[in-house]
């Protein structure tokens, strides 16, 4: 649930950015990068002469609210020009919030969207909560529960949709193993999966491991 599902922004690439932080609560970041290498598969410097550059700007507010705790509120805007691998120019936006509600509980939300027909998800809405160290066993332990609503773009998918929107309920439990690793079982329950003609429901199970160095 943490990713921007409608993003058309390049996953990597050579670029520059600048950050302005007038105080500890506010941060403004803007920049750009080469738009030609959509997948960021390698460091390429010879594409700058093509003059295709992505651009982005974000504003973040990170207050500490008395009686609640730390929070983060941010908005991002970006533009991706049309290139050979992604011919359509797109403009996207994302609004994100997260707020501690005491020492253990936190809530989060995200709303994002994108123009055009490049991303299979053109609008996404997420709301969820996490509970940290529920058994007072390991600081890395965390339980999370979230709900997402995704608008699907049929033109981007390239085939007839059975549903034009998907609803997803996700739950996970990150289980800390000492200080250096977590093991996380995760379940996603899809209601009205867009491309499944045989069922109005689908379930995805995953198991992830994360190492900390």
For each of these PLM feature ranges, what is it?
Residues 1-54, 155:
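Surface-exposed coil loops of outer-membrane beta-barrel proteins
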Residues 8, 46-51, 82-89, 114-124, ...:
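Solvent-exposed loop/turn segments connecting transmembrane beta-strands
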Residues 16, 57-59, 95, 107, ...:
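Membrane-embedded beta-strands of outer-membrane beta-barrel proteins
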Residues 20-22, 61-63, 99, 111, ...:
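Residue-level signature of outer-membrane beta-barrel architecture
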Residues 25-30, 66-73, 104-107, 136-138, ...:
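Repeated loop/turn-to-beta-strand initiation elements of outer-membrane beta-barrel proteins
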Residues 30-34, 73-79, 111-113, 127, ...:
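Transmembrane beta-barrel strands of outer-membrane/channel proteins
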Residues 87-150:
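A beta-strand-loop signature enriched in Asp, Gly, Thr, and Trp
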Residues 201-213:
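Outer-membrane beta-barrel "beta-signal"
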């Amino acid at each position: 649930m943490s990713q921007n599902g409608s993003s058309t922004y390049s996953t990597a690439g050579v670029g520059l950015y600048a950050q302005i932080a007038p105080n500890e609560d506010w941060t403004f970041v803007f920049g750009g990068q080469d738009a030609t290498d959509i997948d960021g598969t390698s460091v390429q410097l010879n594409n700058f002469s093509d003059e295709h550059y992505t651009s982005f700007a974000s504003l973040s507010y990170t207050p500490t609210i008395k009686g609640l705790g730390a929070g983060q509120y941010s908005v991002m805007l970006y533009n991706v020009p049309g290139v050979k691998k992604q011919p359509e120019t797109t403009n996207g936006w994302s609004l994100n919030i997260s707020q501690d509600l005491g020492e253990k509980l936190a809530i989060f939300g995200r709303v994002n969207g994108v123009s055009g027909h490049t991303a299979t998800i053109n609008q996404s809405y997420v709301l969820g909560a996490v509970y940290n160290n529920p058994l007072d066993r390991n600081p890395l332990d965390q339980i999370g529960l979230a709900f997402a609503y995704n608008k699907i773009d049929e033109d981007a998918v390239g085939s007839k949709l059975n549903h034009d929107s998907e609803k997803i309920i996700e739950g996970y439990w990150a289980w800390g193993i000492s200080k250096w690793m977590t093991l996380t079982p995760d379940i996603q329950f899809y209601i009205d999966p867009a491309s499944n003609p045989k069922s109005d429901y689908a379930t995805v199970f995953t198991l992830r491991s994360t190492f900390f160095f």
